[in-house]
């Protein structure tokens, strides 16, 4: 007889009323070719907007924009201060040990400005005894190569780890170009048929190197010191649009990035209190070059853009338990951004030539050199008067530059409706603010220093449950409803002067439902099955006033935000064999504020399927793994962004080796 077990463990005080999604380590370490953009696409309800394979990928929660998503790495915010967003294609999933999503109001516990939510990324000590090593080699379609190496050492006090990922590919996949038509003629040159040509992705090559160094020291007396340093060297061509004409040899379209992120940490833990201090530094150098052959065989630079970002970071946090029912937390953080951006548009004029005989009379040079300090402080009180009931009050204050936002309050409550099945009801309410980014204010041309801060109220309620039967199965799930009214939403729109400029929309109403479920079962001693699914309904409607008589955006869904999204993944294991299937779906997205259903005004819905087969071998001297993956299993033709081609069916193969040196991992 299988005995049913009631699960009602004492939940962490920090999680009272919080809507959070945590990713399993199996998901994060699926294969070395994946970025966090891939992880979020197939394992969460948030929307990932990708400009192509190995190109810019941003995420947005609950019908908000990418700049409404805050991202932290080991406690330090890593959103680009110029753009306000994060490129998740540049974050290897093998560099992340712990990842979670804080939805909506829950993000206020970590940072302000996350009108949609917050992505929390971190690394953790490996708990290694002695020396350890892991090497993985991957090879895939389009001459793609992926390599991963990790070296580890650990003892009673020290944990040291070095990880490196190198990825490269010509990235010249084939696709059907629906933006062009080829004609078939008869003998009299009459058009008798037309077809969409098969083309290759042009100017899409990339070479990315990531190195992560970690050092941890644990005194064994309640103190732990840590150093995390992550270096990125990226060289990526920017693929031509499906509408671009001309020969590939006539263009060079390239983006380069060098970024160093580093965090020093100290954690001091006692029985009923804890103090943490962190200091960090981020340096980013970005370069964009667009060159074109003018017909004389010399590649002339048309656009040359250089940006440097230096960020200094400090944070201090404290926790104090008055009792097992009452917790006080407080924290303060500072980010000092120094940004230098220089753009040159090099125009040609025959009346004034340089040494190559190319004109420079009408060169256009625009730049800005700005600094801004961002301060944030918070205090929270979490109270659990009885085991079933928990309440949390959070107050947060923020200053950007010399401007203070009004106090950001948030209130959370949860209540266990039934111990049987651990059925819990949650509710929360918060006010939130987001300051304009540096590009919003100062970018030339188009920056708007007169922008207002975005502000709004968010309401949320939901249910969750979890059941278990003695090592046989676990079943858990949650459903939540949210309603968010945002004033002065910032959006970049075209102007009559020929460039884009940000403006404030008077009011946006984002609301909807999120559902998530997980199921794991041990069929017998050898067979195991795990299932995970998510669904989101996220209308995001412009409810402001028309800006002109021709404005057709009022009452319409905001651009590039799907109303529906869903994911499903299943993992079946038999001894050392593993089979993984992943599926995701995004509904129709509009490219215009008017929601015009024209050829270029909307992107059709699409679904994606990937499948992976894996086999592990345990030898006397090493553990080996072989893994094969099929991406886009059904060869779906789709677009995530207008005129940005995406790959069809493609394949990857990985071989991994972990030598058995010294003691095994605990």
At which residue positions do the language-model features occur?
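Face-selective signature of the C-terminal outer-membrane beta-barrel domain
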Residues: 216-234, 255-404, 419, 477-481, ...
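Short, acidic, small-residue-rich periplasmic hinge/interaction motif at the N-terminus
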Residues: 1-29, 66
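Gram-negative outer-membrane beta-barrel transporters
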Residues: 384-389, 480-485, 504-591, 663
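Outer-membrane beta-barrel translocator/receptor signature
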Residues: 82, 95-97, 108-182, 205-211
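Short acidic/polar hinge/loop motifs at secondary-structure boundaries
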Residues: 76-103
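Extracytoplasmic beta-strand/coil segments of soluble accessory domains associated
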Residues: 37-80
């Amino acid at each position: 007889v299988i005995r049913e077990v009631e699960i009602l463990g004492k939940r962490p005080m920090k999680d009272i009323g919080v809507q959070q999604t945590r990713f399993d380590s199996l998901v994060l370490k699926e294969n070395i070719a994946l970025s966090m953009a891939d992880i979020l696409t197939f394992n969460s309800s948030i929307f990932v907007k990708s400009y192509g394979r190995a190109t810019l990928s941003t995420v947005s929660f609950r019908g908000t924009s990418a700049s409404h998503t805050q991202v932290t790495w080991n406690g330090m915010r890593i959103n680009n201060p110029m753009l306000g967003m994060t490129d998740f294609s540049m974050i290897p999933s093998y560099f992340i040990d712990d990842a979670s999503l804080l939805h909506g109001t829950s993000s206020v516990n970590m940072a302000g400005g996350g009108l949609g939510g917050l992505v929390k990324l971190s690394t953790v000590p490996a708990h290694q005894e002695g020396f350890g090593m892991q090497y993985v080699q991957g090879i895939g379609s389009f001459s793609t190569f992926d390599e991963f190496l990790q070296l580890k050492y650990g003892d009673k006090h020290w944990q040291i780890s070095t990880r490196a990922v190198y990825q490269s590919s010509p990235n010249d996949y084939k696709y059907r170009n629906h933006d062009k038509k080829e004609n078939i003629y008869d003998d009299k040159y009459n058009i008798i048929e037309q077809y969409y040509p098969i083309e290759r992705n042009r100017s899409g090559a990339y070479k990315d190197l990531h190195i992560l160094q970690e050092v941890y020291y644990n005194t064994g007396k309640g103190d732990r010191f840590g150093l995390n340093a992550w270096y990125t060297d990226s060289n990526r061509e920017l693929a031509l649009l499906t509408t671009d004409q001309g020969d590939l040899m006539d263009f060079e379209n390239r983006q380069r990035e060098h970024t160093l992120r580093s965090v020093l940490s100290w954690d001091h833990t006692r029985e009923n209190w804890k103090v943490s201090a962190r200091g960090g530094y981020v340096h980013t150098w970005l370069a964009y070059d667009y060159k074109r052959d003018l017909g004389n065989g010399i590649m002339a630079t048309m656009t040359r853009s250089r940006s440097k970002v230096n960020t200094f970071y400090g944070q201090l946090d404290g926790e104090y338990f008055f009792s097992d029912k009452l917790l006080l937390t407080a924290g303060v953080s500072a980010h000092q951004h120094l940004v230098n951006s220089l753009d040159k548009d090099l125009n040609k004029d025959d009346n004034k030539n340089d040494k190559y005989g190319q004109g420079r009379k009408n060169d256009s040079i625009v730049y800005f050199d700005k600094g801004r300090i961002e301060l944030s402080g918070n205090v929270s009180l979490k109270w659990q008067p009885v085991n079933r009931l928990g309440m949390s009050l959070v107050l947060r204050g923020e200053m950007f530059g010399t401007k203070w936002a009004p106090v950001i309050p948030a209130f959370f409550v949860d209540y266990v409706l039934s111990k049987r099945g651990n059925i819990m009801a949650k509710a929360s309410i918060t006010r939130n603010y987001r300051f304009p980014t540096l590009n919003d204010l100062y970018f030339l041309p188009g920056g708007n220093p007169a922008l207002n801060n975005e502000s709004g109220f968010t309401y949320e309620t939901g249910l969750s449950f979890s059941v278990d039967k003695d090592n046989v199965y676990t079943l858990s799930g949650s459903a939540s409803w949210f309603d968010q009214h945002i004033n002065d939403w910032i959006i970049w729109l075209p102007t009559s002067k020929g460039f884009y400029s940000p403006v404030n929309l008077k009011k946006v109403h984002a609301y909807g439902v999120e559902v998530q479920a997980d199921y794991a079962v041990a069929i017998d001693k050898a067979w195991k099955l795990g299932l995970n699914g998510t669904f989101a309904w996220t209308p995001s409607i412009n409810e402001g006033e028309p800006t002109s008589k021709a404005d057709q955006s009022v009452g319409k869904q905001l651009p590039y935000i799907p109303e529906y999204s869903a994911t499903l993944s299943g993992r079946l294991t038999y001894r050392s064999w593993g089979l993984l299937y992943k599926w995701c779906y995004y509904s129709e997205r509009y490219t215009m504020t008017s929601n015009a259903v024209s050829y270029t005004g909307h992107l059709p819905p699409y679904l994606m399927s990937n499948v992976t087969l894996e086999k592990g071998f345990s030898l006397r001297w090493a553990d080996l793994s072989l893994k094969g993956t099929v991406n886009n299993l059904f060869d779906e033709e789709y677009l995530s962004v207008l005129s940005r081609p995406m790959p069809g069916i493609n394949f990857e193969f990985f071989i991994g080796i972990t030598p058995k040196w010294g003691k095994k991992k605990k």
